[in-house]
């Protein structure tokens, strides 16, 4: 049996001691799970789901805590201290996560957050982080289709908009002119694939694309008007920011939804807003 450092493992309890229990680590031998992390009803023979990392003395140790990032993942973490060797990030465990100076794009500062990738150092076998995230993003062409829902981590502001890490693997872009809310580096959210371009890069949107989104929004808009005494003080001339603040959609989607309801004679348009047709 082989274990995975920096990830969760299902390991068997093989020994009980005063300061915790030992787990079967296969070729790595017995691994300590300290008392503070041992479940109350734990007994020999039980299998526990534990995260494995190296403690302050570089010994393999287990915990039932869930870290903010695992090996092979990206996250936005805060720097808690620095020394002559690099920076240390809070990742939710007793031992902080190390970022060598060689893996920093700029000198990291205490109190600031940075998007990083966690991995195993080839030489020391330690779990370390790198702010040079580009090298850890997949170069393969994504197998996404237009409209696919994905999880994203906002990574970097550019002249075009915001770069995002998609599903912990690919790079994508949210265009500035399609963003109607405040985004910041480190934010995690759902997004939708607009297209995978010929060069393999992914264009993203925060609104569900296509007719399904419009149909969904038409229903949302109609229900909203009904729930607000049959009137809203928005129309197709309202600022995009006001529309997004109310409904979380672009002005284009809003106008199509309004048009759909108007064609069905469900609403009446006014200079100062919209009412139900029978209001």
Task: Describe the function of each predicted region.
Residues 1-279:
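Single-stranded RNA-binding regions, centering on S1/OB-family and related RNA-binding modules
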């Amino acid at each position: 049996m082989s274990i995975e450092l920096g990830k969760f493992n299902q390991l068997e309890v093989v020994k009980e001691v005063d300061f915790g229990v030992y787990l079967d680590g296969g070729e790595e031998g017995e691994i300590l799970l300290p008392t503070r992390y041992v479940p109350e009803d734990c007994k020999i023979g039980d299998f526990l789901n534990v995260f494995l990392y190296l403690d302050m003395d570089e010994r393999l140790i287990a915990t039932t805590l869930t870290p903010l990032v695992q090996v092979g993942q990206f996250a936005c973490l805060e720097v808690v201290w620095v020394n002559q060797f690099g920076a240390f990030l809070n990742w939710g465990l007793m031992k902080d996560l190390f970022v060598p100076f060689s893996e920093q794009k700029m000198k990291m500062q205490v109190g600031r957050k940075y998007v990083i990738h966690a991995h195993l150092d080839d030489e020391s076998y330690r779990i370390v982080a790198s702010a040079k995230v580009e090298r850890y993003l997949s170069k393969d062409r994504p197998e996404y289709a237009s409209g696919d829902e994905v999880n994203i981590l906002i990574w970097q502001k550019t002249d075009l908009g915001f770069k995002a890490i998609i599903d912990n693997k690919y790079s994508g872009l949210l265009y500035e002119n399609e963003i109607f809310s405040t985004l910041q580096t480190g934010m995690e959210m759902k997004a939708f694939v607009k297209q995978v371009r010929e060069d393999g890069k992914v264009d993203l949107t925060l609104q569900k694309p296509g007719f399904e989104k419009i149909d969904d929004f038409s229903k949302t808009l109609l229900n909203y008007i009904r729930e607000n005494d049959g009137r809203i003080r928005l129309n197709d001339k309202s600022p995009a920011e006001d529309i997004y603040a109310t409904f979380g959609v672009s002005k284009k989607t809003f106008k199509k939804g309004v048009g759909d309801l108007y064609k069905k004679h469900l609403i009446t348009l006014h200079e100062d807003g919209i009412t139900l047709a029978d209001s």
